[in-house]
């Protein structure tokens, strides 16, 4: 490969609705990086890595943890469940991965506490009980934790260093959230789940149980708590290459996604700066990860969605060959044709420098492929995804049809070795979206990657 440029930083973002295969590519690119940074989301994200045939699922810790010697950072834009963090750390340590000496956690991270997940589940249940469509959250407490952050009442990692301050803030927070949870209980739309039972007494989340667990976590977290903003800026000055790892995808961004069917954070590349504490001038290359087809978990509009549960259909082929089940929830992913008009929107809001196309091998064996190049919306032809779920739901895709291929692309590592029709499909995606293809993934394995332009070597 081309030699990496010293002091170069790359942002990796999903360009669809998440699940694009970012984890593998972050792991692959970390060969050229000295630090990997998570800058938004929480343990609702799910990244799967396959290294030497061994599968590892990560939800909170940056994917670079699988590369020995690489430092990993959890930035201020992440909402942190200490309980889930230590579950993940212990799982990695059992597999022989050194974590604690390499992981740095921003003291400004808001904490996810046990009642946040209960609020998340209660609200989804209330929507369903009231006849509304569910948002499709993971039920992990991400949204309620971000709400507390924006309302300026969140408990943050730095509060764990001050037990009296933490206790006072926790009491205020519990008074508010217990009141809300009681209203859901009385409505009959919600019951406390088993995970919350250890924290309950007389139908309320108890201060002592939450506080004592938090103080146990505080002792374990102390060696990893850091001024992540300062450390990242110092690392850059020293010539380190940094990789900023996005979670979820652009169409789940709270501002730019299919609102309200979105997550609670900004998933776009610009948030790599705000969510980690570096200036935007330090973001040198933005790599957009996109599947060779589209998938979505949960509710919300999906213009190119296919019948994916019926055997013998292209959608069923994508679902089964692509093993389209959520890493975090296990829910089946909805499947559909590639949407280049959607990708135009993602390219616009992220400022994409290059694309990485993943899961190309899943399309092997399909006789023909359809590529969405625009939509009919209320009698008008448009060539970019509109803003707003209601408008997107009314979009009728305009397709181009391309020939498929029968030869296997699994494990191909040279572009010229791909079937001619596969190359034409990729070239048409680049033409319609006006974004060059930098990388292509031809299986989940780390080494099954075609490199066109290395993000750390591009001028």
From Swiss-Prot:
User: InterPro entries in the record, alphabetically?
Assistant: Adenylosuccin_syn_GTP-bd, Adenylosuccin_syn_Lys_AS, Adenylosuccinate_synth_dom1, Adenylosuccinate_synth_dom2, Adenylosuccinate_synth_dom3, Adenylosuccinate_synthetase, P-loop_NTPase
Chief location bin:
cytoplasm
Q: Which residues are involved in binding IMP?
A: 19-22, 44-47, 138, 152, 248, 263, 331
Q: Which cofactor does it need?
A: Mg(2+)
Q: Where in the cell is it found?
A: Cytoplasm
**Presence of keyword Magnesium:** yes
Q: How is the cofactor bound?
A: Binds 1 Mg(2+) ion per subunit.
Q: Name one GO biological process term.
A: 'de novo' AMP biosynthetic process
Query: What EC number(s) does this enzyme carry?
Result: 6.3.4.4
Signal peptide span: none
What does the entry list as the binding residues for substrate?
327-333
Q: Which UniProt keywords apply?
A: Cytoplasm, GTP-binding, Ligase, Magnesium, Metal-binding, Nucleotide-binding, Purine biosynthesis
What is this protein called in UniProt? Adenylosuccinate synthetase
């Amino acid at each position: 490969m081309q030699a990496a440029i010293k002091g170069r930083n790359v942002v990796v973002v999903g360009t669809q609705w998440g699940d694009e295969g970012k984890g593998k590519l972050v792991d692959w690119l970390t060969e050229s990086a000295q630090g990997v940074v998570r800058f938004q989301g929480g343990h609702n994200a799910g990244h799967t890595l396959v290294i030497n045939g061994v599968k590892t699922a990560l939800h909170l810790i940056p994917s670079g943890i699988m590369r020995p010697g690489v430092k990993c950072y959890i930035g201020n834009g992440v909402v942190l469940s200490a309980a889930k963090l230590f579950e993940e750390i212990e799982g990695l340590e059992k597999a022989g991965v050194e974590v604690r000496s390499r992981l740095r956690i921003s003291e400004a991270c808001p904490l996810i506490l046990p009642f946040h997940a209960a609020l998340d589940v209660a609200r989804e249940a209330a929507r369903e009980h009231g006849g509304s469509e569910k948002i499709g959250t993971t039920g992990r407490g991400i949204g309620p934790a971000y709400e507390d952050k924006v309302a300026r009442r969140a408990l943050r990692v730095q509060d764990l260093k001050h037990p009296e301050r933490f206790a006072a803030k926790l009491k205020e927070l519990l008074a508010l959230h217990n009141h809300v949870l009681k209203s859901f209980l009385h409505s009959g739309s919600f019951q406390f789940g088993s995970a919350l039972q250890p924290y309950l007494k007389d139908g309320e989340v108890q201060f002592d149980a939450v506080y004592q667990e938090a103080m146990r976590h505080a002792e374990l977290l102390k060696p990893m708590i850091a001024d992540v903003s300062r450390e990242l800026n110092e690392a850059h000055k020293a010539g380190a290459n940094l990789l900023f790892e996005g979670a979820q995808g652009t169409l789940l961004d709270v501002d730019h996604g299919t609102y309200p069917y979105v997550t609670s954070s900004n998933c776009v590349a610009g948030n790599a700066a705000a969510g980690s504490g570096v200036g935007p001038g330090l973001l040198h290359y933005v790599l957009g990860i996109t599947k060779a087809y589209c998938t979505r978990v949960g509710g919300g509009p999906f213009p190119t969605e296919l019948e994916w549960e019926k055997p013998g259909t292209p959608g069923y082929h994508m679902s089964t060959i692509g093993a389209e089940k959520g890493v975090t929830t296990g829910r089946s992913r909805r499947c559909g044709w590639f949407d280049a008009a959607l990708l135009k929107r993602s390219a616009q809001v992220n400022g994409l420098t290059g694309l990485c196309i993943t899961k190309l091998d899943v399309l092997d064996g399909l006789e023909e492929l359809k590529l969405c190049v625009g939509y009919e919306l209320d009698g008008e032809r448009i060539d970019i995804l509109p803003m707003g779920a209601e408008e997107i739901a009314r979009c009728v895709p305009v397709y181009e049809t391309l020939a498929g291929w029968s030869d296997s692309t699994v494990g191909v590592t040279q572009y010229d070795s791909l079937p001619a029709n596969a190359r034409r499909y990729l070239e048409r995606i680049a033409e319609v979206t006006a974004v060059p293809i930098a990388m292509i993934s031809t299986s989940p394995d780390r080494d099954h990657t075609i490199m066109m332009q290395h993000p750390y070597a591009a001028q």
